[in-house]
Amino acid sequence: MKRFAVLLVLSLLFQCELFAQNTVNSFQKYPVFPNCENESIDGLELCFNNTVRELIYNNFEEPAIVSEENYKGPLNIFFEVDREGAIKLLYVDAVYTELKDEVARVFDQFPKIEPATYNGNPTYTQYTVNLTVPLGEFVAETEAPVEEETTTGSGNDLIGNEINPEYDALEKNVYENEEYRSAINIPLSHHNYSLFDPAMNQVGTNSHTAQKPFLYSEVNKYYNFEEQQASILTNKTSWFGRKFWDQHMVTIKGKDYWITLDPGVDLQVGRDFDTDVDTYNNTRLVYTQGGIGKKINFFAVVYESQGRFADYFNRYAIERRPDGGNAGIIPGRGIAKLFRSDSFDYPIATGHVSYTPSEHFNLQLGHGKNFIGDGYRSLLLSDNASPYPYFRLNTTFWKIKYTNTWMSLRDVRSEVTADGSFRTKYMANHYLSYNITKRLNIGLFESVIWENDNDRGFDVNYLNPVIFFRAIEFSTGSRGGNALIGLSAKYKFTNRVNAYAQLIIDEFSSSDIFGGEGSYKNKTGYQLGAKYYDAFGVKGLYLQGEYNRVRPFTYSHNTVVLNYGHNNQSMAHTLGTNFSEFIAIARYQYRRIFGDVKVIVAKRGFEFNTPEDSFFYGGSIYGTEDNRIADLGNELAQGNTTDFFHAEVQGGYLINPATNLKVYASVIFRDFQPMVDTEVNFANQTTWLNFGVRTDLFNWYNDF
C-alpha cells in the first residue's frame, strides 16, 4: 500500500512536470553540468537530461539478484538539485533493496554543479528519472521530451520536477511599523492612553477623544508613535537583544500585506497579607496583527490563564458565578472553572477585523470591549465587563464623529438559563461627538437593550443608525426594550488643562427627575472630572481628578434581563449603582520608567439580603424594581451604607515598547466598612502586594 502511494505521487509529479518541461521560463535556466557550460539556454534542458542519464548508466553496477531472478521492471528515482548545486537523492522506488542501495552509491558520485536560477537567483529544483531494469546501453536523446510525446522502447526517461518559483518570487520587505498607520485598535490601557492624551487634547485640534478604543491612524496624526519609540530604543545589535527590548518577535511584510506575531505573558506573584493568602496569575498569550491591502486590518489575541487573587477579588468572582457549575467570573475577563481546588482557570480570546473603505468610514467586527468617555470611569459605556461580540461603525467628517455599536450580550443567571444555554440579549449604542469650537466638545448618547423573547432574535428595527431610538422602543412594545440616554462634554482651558463631564438618564421621566421627592424613577448619574498634563512643569506628569455619582436603581430594570449588564457585570461603572465616588490619579513616565498612584474614596449602598430585610434598595443592577423599598424618599447610598477606600501604587519598567511588555510591582490597600455585616458584605481590609511581568493589552480593574 505504501509503495502504491509513492508510485501515485511520482506518477502525479511525472504528469505535472512533463507539461512544465515545455516552459523553461518557469525557472528560466536549468542546472548546468561542466560539460554543458557552452550550451545555449534552450539546449541546457537536453544536456542536463542526457548527462544525468549517462552518469547513471556508466556507473550503475547491476546487483546479482536481478540476473539471478531474471527480473525486469521499473526503477524510479526522485532527486533534487539545491540552491548550492548539490545533487541529493530523495527516494528510490524499486523491488529490491539492492537496487536502492546501488542507486544511492551512484548518486554519491555525482559532482556539484551550477544550480537552476530564477530571475538570476539560485533556486531549488526536483527531478524524476524513470528507468527500466536491466538498463541496457545508454543512448543519448536528440531533443527534449514534449508534452504530447509517448514513451516507447526502454522507457528510460528523465522528467524535470522543478519547484514552482512563485514561492521564491514573493516580496520580502522590511517591516516599517505599519501598525502605527493602520486602522487597528490601540489596546485599552489607561496608562498607555495617558501618554498620547495630551497630544489629542491640544486647543484647536479637531480630534474626538471619547470614543475608544482609538485607531492607531487616528492618534498618529497628533502623536508620532515612531518618533517616541525611536527615542527610547536600546539599539541592541544581536537578534535576541532587538526582539526582546525593541521589536516584535516575528514581522512579515510583502507587497500588499504585513503581519506581526508575538508571544506574551501576564505573570503575577503576590500576597494578601490580611488573609495570609499567596496570590498568582499565570497567563500565556499569543497575539497577531496585520494588514491586507490598504483597507483591511486585523488583530487577534488568545489567552490561557490560571490565577488566585486577593480574598476580596476571589469573593467578587465567586459571587458572580454563572449558572451551570462554573467557579466564577473573573472581573473584566470571563467565565472561570475551578483549578486545583482554590484557583480559577479562565481562557479567553479577543480580536477584530477592521475595514476602512474611505477616510470617513471605519467598520469593525470583533470580540472585545468599547469605552465612551474622557474619564477613568464611564457612566455611558466602559470596559468593565467581559469581552463580547460587537459590530461598530465609525463615521468621521467635518467636526463630527458618529459611532454606532451593536453588541451581543449574555445574562448568565440561573433564573434565565434554559437547557444549559445562557440568555442572549442585545445592545445598540449611538454616540455623536461634535466639536462646537476649538475648545468645546459635546456628545449625545443613546443605548437600548432588548432580549431574544418570542424568538425575536436581533431586532432589525435597531439597525437604524440615526440617533434616538425612543420612538422605535415604543413601536416594538412598551416592554420591548430598555433605553438610556446621555450627554457628555469636554472643555479645553489650555493645552495642559481640560475638564470633562457625563450625564446618564435611565428611563427618562422629567417629573420624577426634577420632582425632588426621591422617586425610584429618578435613575440618573453624573460625572465631573479634570486633567492636568505636564503638571507643575514636570514633563510626563499626568494628574486627574474625577467625581462620579449614580442614584439607586440606575441601570436596573423591572425585567432584570434588560438591565445594563453582561456576564453579571456592569456595562458602565465598575461600582454599578447607588454610590458616590471621588478618584485622584497621578501617572508619570520617563523614558521606560513609569509609575501610577490612584486613590478612591466612595460611599456605596447595598441590599441587606436577610430574612428580616429582603427589599431591593437599588444597590445592584441585577435587582428587580418590583421588590423596591419605596416609590419615594430614595436617597443616595441607601440600604446597607458602606464606606469604601482604595489606594493603589504601581511602579515599573517598560521592557519592550513594541509589545508593551512591562515588569512592575504594585501594592493595594483596600478598606470596606458596611453599616451592617452580612454574608456578602462585611467589614474587611486588604493589603495586597504584587510583582509581575505583563504584556499590557487590557485594563485590570481591582478597585471595587
Residues covered by each model-derived region:
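Residue-level preference for beta-strand/loop junctions
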Residues: 71-73, 123-125, 280, 345, ...
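A mature extracytoplasmic/lumenal domain signature
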Residues: 79, 91-94, 129, 135, ...
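Generic short beta-strand segments
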Residues: 111-112, 263-269, 667-670
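Exposed, low-structure sequence patches enriched in small/polar residues
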Residues: 3, 346, 440-704
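Bacterial N-terminal signal peptides
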Residues: 7-15
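A solvent-exposed, charged loop/short amphipathic helix patch at secondary-structure junctions
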Residues: 28, 318-331, 617-632
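Charge-biased low-complexity segments
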Residues: 6-7, 20-154
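Outer-membrane beta-barrel channel domains
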Residues: 161-441, 447-452, 515-524, 531, ...
